Design a protein with these regions (language model features):
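A cross-family phosphate/adenosyl-ligand binding-site feature
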Residues: 1-111, 115-181
Length: 181
């Protein structure tokens, strides 16, 4: 709702996603129709299940009972001093893409914060293998500013470093064109 949206274009369709499950359903339905997927959405690792007061949790003999409950009120009660939030793991959607379309060229992103370049590359390589991606664009948040955006393009046998958003866009376009040839 509050995200910056691109200008309308005849070759652009915008689908609004409210949660991880919406994304899963949209991707599963649509990914089969494409040759290249740029998976740039930062999908939350966890989603809220239920929130309750600490007293209710302490009184419970089985914490799993809270996993099947739902909060129905829109506002959180302010009567409890301490609230406990139960979360559940969401599916890793990028890891499902190749199941849905084994031939698709998959491009993903990895954003870490204040890590060494070697660690950033290592984590990006792990993502490349785990998700069967063709390319992972790795970023460190501390290396991103209004005038600079250091990014490392990590492929199976190649690393390329760029310094700006424009260089990222140009190299990404070059990679996509290469998939087509």
């Amino acid at each position: 709702r509050s995200a910056l949206k691109p200008e309308p274009h005849p070759h652009l369709t915008i689908r609004e996603i409210k949660n991880t499950n919406d994304l899963l359903l949209e991707m599963k339905e649509r990914v089969q129709d494409y040759q290249v997927l740029i998976h740039s959405m930062a999908v939350s690792d966890y989603t809220p299940v239920y929130m309750t007061g600490l007293d209710a949790v302490e009184a419970s003999s089985n914490l799993e009972e809270f996993l099947s409950k739902q909060n129905h009120q829109a506002k959180i009660s302010s009567t409890d001093e301490v609230q406990v939030l139960f979360l559940k793991k969401t599916p890793k959607i990028i890891s499902l893409v190749k199941e849905w379309n084994p031939a698709i060229h998959l491009i993903g992103f990895k954003l870490l914060v204040d890590v060494t370049e070697d660690h950033l590359i290592e984590v990006a390589r792990q993502s490349l293998v785990k998700n069967q991606a063709d390319l992972i664009i790795a970023n460190d948040l501390t290396q991103i500013s209004a005038h600079q955006h250091l990014a490392i393009f990590v492929e199976k046998d190649r690393l390329q470093t760029v310094q700006t958003k424009e260089e990222i866009a140009n190299l990404l376009l070059e990679k996509i064109h290469a998939y087509d040839s």
